[in-house]
Amino acid sequence: MLKFRNFFKLTLLTLASAFFLSGCANINLISAVGSSSVQPLLNKLSSYYVLNENNDNDKLVEISVQAGGSNAGIRAIINGFADIGNVSKNPKEYAKENEKKWRDKKLKTLTIGKDAIAVIYKAPQELKGKLLLTKDNINDLYDLFAGVKTINIDKFVKKDTKNMSNEKDYPLTSFPRTGGSFASGTAEAFLNFSALKSDKTLDSQTRDILKGIINYGPLAKPTSETNIEAFNTFVTNLQDPNLFGMIYLSLGFIQNNLQAIKNNGFEILPIKYENKEVLPSNQTVSQNEYKWVRPLNSIVSLSEENKNIDEIKTFFNWLFFNGKKDVIKNIYDEFGILQLTEDEKKKMFKTNDSSPMNLENFWVDDFAFSNPIFGAF
C-alpha cells in the first residue's frame, strides 16, 4: 500500500505540474519520474538545456524531473503518467512481464550514463583499512544486509590481519534500501552486479529478502532510497562508538561527499578481483578494473500518440550527439557519473553505427532489435 501511495503522489505531482504549465504559451512540459540516482544528473542536464539550448520559440520546453525510485519510473512510463521513466537498472524483466504495453507504446531504453555501487563501513580503530570484499565473503555481505543472521566484522578482515580481531567479536549492522531490488535500482545493482562469483549458493531466504519478496530481518535498518537520506541514517544510527556497520551507496555520491565520509570515520570497502585489490573510482571503473557497475537509464515512448516525442528526441540528441562536449562532461563529473563510450553507444543503434547521421536507426524501440538488450548494457 505504501508503494502505491508514493506512486500515486508522484502521479498527482506530475499532473499538477502539467496543469500549471498548460497555461503558459508555447511551453511544453516533459515529465520525468523515477530513479533517485538518475534524478540529479538528468535535472542538471535538462536545466542547462532548457536555459541555454532550447531556442525554438515554437517548441519551448520545461523538463520536470522527479525522484521516487526505479519501480515508480517504470510504472509511470508503462502507464503513460510520465514522458520519461528513469531507471537505474536494466528493465529487461519488466519489459518481458509487460511486453504488450512495451510494444504498444514503442518504448526505448536510453542509457545516459553509468555509475558504480560501493560499500562504506564503520570499523573499530584497529581494523580501519583492514577489510576486503572477495568472492569468498560476498555471500556473507548479502546475509548481513538481509538482516536475519548475525554477521561479525571478522568475515571481512583480510587474512593477513585476522589475528588483530580475535579477542572480540564486532557484530555489524546493515543499512539496505527499503523495498529491496523490487523497488530500488541501487538495491538491484547491489544484489546482481558485483561481478564476484561465489563457489557457494546464496541462501534462498537471503535472496528473497534482498529482492523485496519478504521483509528484512530485525538486524537490518532499511533506509530511504536517496543516497543522502540513506547516508544520514547511517551516520545517525552509528553515533555510538561501540556500534559498527555497512551501507551501499552510489560511487558518484561517495566521491562528492568523500570529506564527510572521512570526517565521520568511515572507510570505503575495496574488492578483490582475481588477485588484485581495487578501490572504486571513476578511473578504475572506466578501466574495467572495478566491476560493480550499473546503467542509468531513461525510458521514452516513441509512439505516434506521444505529443512530446519531437522535443524529447531533440533533447536526447543534444545530450548524446550535438551538445557541447565539455559542458556536458563537466555536469557528469560534478555527479561522479561516467559517460558512455562510443562502443557502448553503438549498442543502442539498430545497425551498430553511432554516427549522428544514422539517427533513424537510433530512434527505434527496444523490441525492434533482433536481440533486445534494453539500453547499452
Swiss-Prot record:
Keyword S-adenosyl-L-methionine in annotation: no
GO CC annotation: plasma membrane
Pfam families: PBP_like_2
Entry annotated with the keyword Hydrolase: no
Source organism superkingdom: Bacteria
Record localization: Cell membrane
Keywords, comma-separated and alphabetical: Cell membrane, Lipoprotein, Membrane, Palmitate, Signal
Lipidation (N-palmitoyl cysteine): C24
PROSITE patterns: PROKAR_LIPOPROTEIN (PS51257)
Membrane topology: Lipid-anchor
Lipid-carrying residues in chain (S-diacylglycerol cysteine): C24
Signal peptide start and end residues: 1-23
Protein name: Uncharacterized lipoprotein MG412
